[in-house]
Amino acid sequence: MAADKAGEQGAEKHEDSANCSGISDHEKELSRSALQAFTAGNYEACLQHLGELKEINKDDYKVILNSAVAEFYKSDQTTTDLLKQTLNQLRNEVHSAIDEIDSLDDVENSMLYYNQAVILYYLRQHMEAISIGEKLYQFIEPFKEKFAHAVCFLLVDLYLLTFQTEKALHLLVVLEKMILQGHSNNKNGKNNETNSNANNREPFAQRGDGGVHVEAAKSKIHQYKVRAYIQMKSLKACKREIKSVMNTSGNSAPSLFLKSNFEYLRGNYRKAVKLLNSSNIAEYPGFMKTGECVRCMFWNNLGCIHFAMGKHNLGLFYFKKALQENDNTCAQLPSSNTDPGKKFSSRPMCTLLTNKRYELLYNCGIQLLHIGRPLAAFEYLIEAVQVYHSNPRLWLRLAECCIAANKGTSEQETKGLPSKKGIVQSIVGQGYHRKIVLASQSVQNLLYNDGESSAIPVASMEFAAICLRNALLLLPEDQFDAKQENGSKTSSQTGNTDSGGESSEVCSNKSHEGDKFIPAPPSSPLKRQEVENLRCSVLACSAYVGLALGDNLMALNHAEKLLQQPRLSGSLKFLGHLYAAEALISLDRISDAITHLNPENVTDVSLGVSSNEQEQGSDKGENEPMESVGKQMPQCYPSSVTSARTMMLFNLGSAYCLRSEYDKARKCLHQAASMIHPKEIPPEAILLAVYLELQNGNTQLALQIIKRNQLLPSIRMMSDLRKKPLFQTMHQPMQPIQMPAFTAVQRK
């Protein structure tokens, strides 16, 4: 772990300074003894030697630094706040800010900055840690080999956590050359070891087992490369490195987890599950030593695999198991100190990274949304958004929960109208006074506010509007100006449903393209194409919510913005025209609405954008394991261009009715009915036919349409009715039936 390196290097620092002129032999001996005691784990003796050194030279901040590190290890790494405070005080004595590290003179203070970077790493302040690490990397040449490796490994880990995979791969290449070159120099320099003074023999003695150190470093490099390639989805390069990992690490839990992730990306889900089950997680060190709950990762990864397989209920089961394991693990940790100055103390520093509750809540919420339990999903996601409030995709998911929770009778909408029960609410009276009461279809357009503030997080349409507004604000105005902001708190070990990887040769050619993304923790950052797709989805949902709330101007604004997007999928273009038409009809702009309802506007209803640009780093074009893979067609969605054009014609007929152009409306109705199966005709179309016949004075024909639950009676029935007078003359003026907006039953 990085903390171990921090302590070892911190204890070595003063020992190295003993070579400086003006230092007595007694100080050198004390320095050497302190290092030996620290390496042996005898922190009491180490502190005693450092105390004697401090009495000799009270102004040497390096002794204070080493004492702070030794005290930290003596407390089993539980005094994180005290160590952080000491390092900040020492830094203020040396420099007022990290930005002042601009010369080789700062090499003397490198150990102080490195220890600060390690603490920031465990506090999940990744960007601050990277800032320090990159400053140290500028002066890495004078550093000792082991310390230089520690700086590089820390930077690589930080780059991967912040999804800067290209920088990580470049640094791994440099690190690999550094290790091979250092190993070669050690072999050539063995003859000079006996001529070194006692102060220099100790570092050489530590590198006496250089072969073991080099092999361990190589194994770690291979694992980091696999993680980078997985992030960039470079499966060919990842396959090569996986072989190296298995050769160097064997069937250890980390190597099997990485190989399982690789098979998961390839779509070999059964093999990925088999690899996970073959890992012996019981032999892996406990979370108190590593800060990682392997059981939690195991269940989470199983949940992700079953999510990709479309087995959402089983995936939810595994995610809940992971959440339970995470809660049990956190319960074993000492309770946090109530003192604000000691909130990170009382437990090992590595355990500050143990809690993955909010990542798991996010996964559970997405899984529940796919299952069709929006209210339960809302409860999980509303808790996750308190931490990941900068994720626009998460705000969209919350809005989708609200929309789905307030959706109408989706079963009836999906299956069409199985019986007249769908349009007939009740029958009152008998004989001459017998009346048919038609069901109202306009309840969906009622406001949902019951007097509560719309800012209260409940699954209402008002709150959905707020969520969508937040999502739009978090997206960059110009998709080509998306900045590289990597301050995400994601963990590459938990296997979230979004992931990414590619070789250094390939990524170097695509660096400019890959740098354009915005963070979306706990998922992968959003790339340019993903930002465009997300904006289209948010605009479509915003138009739908605006219509549901009766805010027609806002709905029209969002629908028009949606239709102006340069890369718009056929499905969202279809919805954009429908939503714009409904808003225009509500605003009494029928002519403009008819323009949007032209069936020729629909040429494609695919969920994706046909593009020559493939996912960056994808070698084959495997399906990306995200929650938006679109493996199943959403309910209530037109399955073909024909059904979409039919929906357009039904709506166009309604628009013509509003202008009293009943012949055109009847023509649209007949044309639409001839394009689909009678069972697929929506109940609103039946009502439209009834309305047209009533306007034409054909009361009995309208009754027959309701009775037979068919859009048009048989030809024989129509000819018979033409010969007979109408059954009853209406004594009251005809009241037009309020036609529902067909787009209200559409859902993305």
From Swiss-Prot:
Keyword presence, Transcription regulation: yes
Subcellular localization: Cytoplasm; Nucleus
Polar residues biased stretches: 487-509, 605-615
Composition skew (Basic and acidic residues), residue ranges: 1-17
GO biological process: one example: regulatory ncRNA-mediated gene silencing
Region: Disordered, residue numbers: 1-25, 184-205, 483-524, 605-635
UniProtKB keywords: Cytoplasm, Nucleus, RNA-mediated gene silencing, Transcription, Transcription regulation, Translation regulation
A cellular component term, taken from the record's GO annotations: cytoplasm
SUPFAM superfamilies in the record: TPR-like
Biased composition (Low complexity): 185-200
InterPro entries: CNOT10, TPR-like_helical_dom_sf, TPR_rpt
Superkingdom, natural source: Eukaryota
Complex formation: Component of the CCR4-NOT complex. cnot10 and cnot11 form a subcomplex docked to the cnot1 scaffold.
Reported function: Component of the CCR4-NOT complex which is one of the major cellular mRNA deadenylases and is linked to various cellular processes including bulk mRNA degradation, miRNA-mediated repression, translational repression during translational initiation and general transcription regulation. Additional complex functions may be a consequence of its influence on mRNA expression. Is not required for association of CNOT7 to the CCR4-NOT complex.
Sequence similarity: Belongs to the CNOT10 family.
Protein name: CCR4-NOT transcription complex subunit 10-A
Species of origin: Xenopus laevis (African clawed frog)
